[in-house]
C-alpha cells in the first residue's frame, strides 16, 4: 500500500476505498520490517492506531475531515510532542519526555494528521550526514553504504523509503534541503518566521526554521498551509497572512519564468555528474519556455565562515541549559556540583556538538567578539542585500543543492571542514532568511539522487513550490 501523493491517499480515504486504520497499519508494518535502517528513534504503534481509528469514526459520523485527514507523518526528534521522548538524538536528553506540543504539532493534530513516530537526526541538528547521532547513522535509501544527508536525514529517508508520506524536519543551514537532495524527495525551508519555532529545540535561533519533506511540491504546500502563520508563543513568527498556496502554485508557468543562474554555484570544483544533471534540467526548462538569466553572488565564498560563526555563537548560548541539573542525562561520576556540570556535558554531548559549543564560546569572548561575531553579522547584511537585488530581477534562483552526490558513511567524519562544505550552496539562503527548497532532478552515474535548489523571495513559497512542481514534472515529459 503505497501512495504517490496525499491527494491520491485522501481521495481513497474519503471514498471509503480503505480505512485510516488500514493505511496506518501498512505504514507501521513497513517501519517494523525496516527497523535495522535506524530511521525511526521511536514508533508510536498504539497511539498512531488510536488516532487512525478515531479518524475512521469521525468519517462514519459524517463529520468534516481535516485538511490533512489521515496523512501519515514522521516527526524529527527535535520537535516536541507531549508525552513522547524528545532526544534530539543526544545522550544528554536520552531520558527526557516532552511536556507540551509544539505549535506545528498542535496545528497538525487539529487537521487530522497521524504521527507514526520520531525519526533520527544529527545530534541537536548539527551535521550534514546523520552520523552525529547517539543512535547511530541512517543509510541512504538508494545505497546503504552512503549517507542520507543531514541533519534531517531520518526525515528524508522515511519519506524516500515509504515509511511516512510526509515528514517534518528543521533547517538551520540546509538540514532539510541537503538530505532531500540526497534522498530524491522535495525539501522546503520556508522564509524565517513563516512557521512558529515554539516547541522546537533551538540550535541557532535566528536561523532555525521547521521544514517539510515530501514526495512532491503539492504535499509540501498542503502541510505548509496548515502549519504556517503567526503564533503568540514565538515572537519571531511572522504576522504576514498565510495565502492559498495551491492557488499560487497554479499561477506559475515555465513559459516566461525568469530563473537566475549564479556563476558561484557552478565552480570548477563542482562534481561533474552533479553539474551535468543540473545543466540537463536547466536546458530542458529553457526549451519549455523558461528564461535563464546569469547573475552573480560574489560573497558566496564567505557563507560557510559567517554561518559557522553565527550559529555556533547562538548554539553555545542555547545549549547552556543542558547541564544535568534540571532534566536529561546526569553523570554519576561527580564529586561536587561543578564536577556534575562538567561531566554531564562532557559525557552527554557528542564530539561535533562540543566542537560547536567551544567555537561559539570563543567567537563571543570579549577579545574576539568584534573580530568574528560582529563581522559575521555585517556579512549577513551584505548577503541579505545581495539576494534582494538579485531577486528583484528574477523569479527564482537555481543551482545544485549539494556540490557532490551522497558520500560514503564515515568518509568525512574525520574532516569537519570537508563535511561543512556539503552545505556550501544551502547556507546562503539561511543567512538571508529567504525561502529555498530542493527538488529531485535526476541521478548521477552511480544511480544516486541529485537535487536542484530553488531560492525565492521573502514569503513567496507559493511561487517557489509552483516552480518546483514544474521542474519535477518537466522530467516526466
UniProtKB/Swiss-Prot annotation:
Keyword check for Manganese: no
Active-site residues from the entry: 76, 151, 175
Signal peptide: none
Pfam families: Amidase
GO cellular component, one term: glutamyl-tRNA(Gln) amidotransferase complex
Matches recorded under InterPro entries: Amidase, Amidase_CS, Amidase_dom, AS_sf, GatA
Domain of life from the UniProt record: Bacteria
Protein name (database record): Glutamyl-tRNA(Gln) amidotransferase subunit A
UniProt organism field: Prosthecochloris aestuarii (strain DSM 271 / SK 413)
Organism phylogeny: Bacteria, Pseudomonadati, Chlorobiota, Chlorobiia, Chlorobiales
